[in-house]
Amino acid sequence: MSILLKDLVGGIENKLYMSAMKFNAIANGGLANLVNLSNEQIVDAVVSQYKITLEEIEETEKALVDNDEVEIYDGYCDVFYTFKYFQSLLVYCYGKRDKETVDEVDSLIDAVDLGNRYVALLLKTVELDLSILDEYADRVIENNMQKFTTSLEEFKTWESDYIPTSKEYDGKL
């Protein structure tokens, strides 16, 4: 991979990572909140992000085999979005938690295989049109951020569209 291509892909990858950081900061406090989590919660967070990332990698690998152009570009964006955040969680766990917690994480995931598959996908970016990948990245970011409002005024006036179909819950009225 040429230095220019590496820089271009790295820029797209970083843009998606920064968006993932922002998304997770809004959704669950992000990396800054990790110090407040128990070891069990850290294990759950790492394993959950691992599973999400693995699923995105598998979908992208399948799209490459099927030569499904839309899913290839979407998949790369999803992989970039999820992998770097997974990596950040893993680095935190390895650096800040006790050996027992790290050993539990290691017993539940295969970070080396995931990393190798990620690198294999990175090497295939030479086959992509990076302007299209960049456009997809913007769409993925926009879609994910639409899940939250950035307006405090809008948030204060938000009302659920949920209409209960019954007043019964847990067998009681």
Predicted regions and their residues:
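Flexible "arm" and connector segments at domain edges
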Residues: M1-L173
